[in-house]
Structure formats: C-alpha cells, structure tokens
A protein has these predicted regions:
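Acidic, Gly/Ser/Thr-rich repeat motifs that build Ca2+-stabilized beta-propeller blades
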Residues: 2-146, 198-211, 265-266
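Beta-propeller domain segments
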Residues: 67-69, 142-266
C-alpha cells in the first residue's frame, strides 16, 4: 500500500449534524446520498448545505450495534440500499431495495433481494454495494454462523451478483458451474465483508473483509470461488485465542487474499 503521497491530502468538514451515517454515494459534484443507521436516506447538497430526507416504507430494524440502514449506491438515476430487514419476530436478514430518484422522491422503491434464511442474530450483515458491467454486486455477512459460510444453499458469508433490476444473471455459478449454489451467489467463504469497490485500474471488484482476532483482509471478487471461512481464518484466531480450523491461514483450493492484517486493523 503506497502512502508516499499522503502529504498531498487534507481533511475538510463538508457537512455535519448527521446521526451515525453508514453509507454515501455521490449523485454529482455537489449532491450525494447518505444513509443513517436509524433508517433515514438523506440527499445532501454540499454547496447549499440543504438536507432532504427521502421517504420510504422499508422495514428497517436498527438492531444491536451493527444493523440498520446500511449502504447506498446511486447509479444512472437509480438508488440501491442495503439494510437490516425485520422479517418476522426477531428474525432479520440483509436485504436490498431499489428505486428511481425523481425530483427528490423514490419511485417504485421496493425490495429486489432478501438473504435467506432469516435468523435471530444482530451482527455480521456485510451489506456493501457496487456496480460493474451492469451487474449489482453485494456482500452478505455470515451472521455469526461460522461454517454456514461453506454452505451455498444459504446466503451466509457470500458475495452475490444480480442484474440491476434484481433478476438473476444466467451466467451466475449456481446456473452454470456450481449447480448446488443458490442462484444469486457469486462467491462464498467470507465472514463480514464491509468494503467493496470497483477498481478504476483493472475494472475488477475488490472487497475488505473483517477477520476474527486477526485476519482482516483485502481481496478480489472472483466467480465461483471460496475464501474459506471458517475452514481458515486468514491467520487469525477466535476471540478467546483458540485456533480456528487447523490453524492454517490458507488451504489449496481456496482463494488467497491479496493482503491480510495480523492483528486486525478494524
């Protein structure tokens, strides 16, 4: 990681008065969308300092210290958000909704994806969004279910890929090479990936993933592959110091992270 030119950057306060902001996405040079964990989607003009709350009817549940309204992505007039959805009782999921932004209103705003199954836990939602080549990529955390990230018949611990309207691409692994996978799944074996971006250098999708006690990593999203949680912990251990798996940081057949941190940086 090159920090040689860090002296060329400075911090400037652009807007304040927000309540636990989680995601943001620019509409243009002056306007951006910001989510707050308590459930709001805000449109902010950095030039005029105007703040508008966009109405929606999503069942956002701010649960624990990680759940709530999470990422937001603006793409070609459409707004995509990921959030903690209350499904029934205390059972929740990582869900994605989308709609068109028209005159500061969200039109036809509705769910296009719900991770399954809904369960009663309050951590590890994943939830970061990115668009590449007219596909929507999203991360789903393993909801503290450990080895469930190795079971592609659920969405725990996965990267999913959808068409922009929420339909499933015919080239996804579950419809081609990995017929036992749920059709939305593109990659498995992650723990709690909360960073995702498309590189302007090679147009590939990259993620950052929270390891346990050690093992945070930066890596590439690749079709039909497996990062290995909880067969491996990328050099980390459980929080009580116990070994995860056989203690290996990596095994043959699994994807290697590009860079990992021990101890964890998050």
């Amino acid at each position: 990681i090159n920090t040689a030119h860090s002296e060329n950057y400075s911090l400037e306060k652009a807007f304040d008065g927000l309540n636990r902001p989680w995601g943001m996405s620019f509409i243009d040079d002056h306007n951006l969308l910001v989510t707050q964990k308590s459930g709001e989607i805000l449109k902010i003009n950095l030039k005029t300092q105007e703040k508008i709350e966009l109405d929606h009817n999503l069942k956002v549940l701010e649960v624990g210290w990680q759940g709530g309204m999470l990422d937001v992505l603006f793409h070609e007039g459409m707004v995509y958000v990921s959030y903690t959805e209350k499904r029934y009782g205390k059972h929740t999921t990582t869900s994605i909704a989308a709609g068109k932004l028209v005159n500061d209103r969200l039109e036809n705003f509705k769910n296009i994806f719900r991770s399954d199954p809904p369960i009663d836990t309050d951590i590890h939602w994943g939830s970061r969004l990115a668009v590449k080549d007219n596909y929507l990529f999203a991360s789903v955390g393993e909801r503290a279910q450990g080895m469930a990230a190795q079971d592609p018949t659920n969405h725990f611990g996965t990267i999913i890929r959808l068409n922009l309207d929420g339909s499933i691409p015919e080239s996804n692994p579950g419809l081609t090479t990995n017929k036992d996978w749920l059709p939305e799944i593109y990659q498995i074996g992650v723990r709690n990936p909360q960073g995702m971006a498309v590189s302007p250098i090679d147009n590939e999708v990259y993620i950052t993933n929270h390891g346990p006690k050690g093992g945070d990593f930066f890596g590439k999203v690749s079709k039909g592959s497996n990062y290995g949680w909880m067969l491996v912990a990328w050099g980390g251990t459980d929080y009580d110091g116990s070994i995860i798996g056989d203690g290996s940081a990596w095994k043959p057949g699994l994807v290697k992270p590009i860079y990992r941190w021990i101890p964890s940086i998050a």
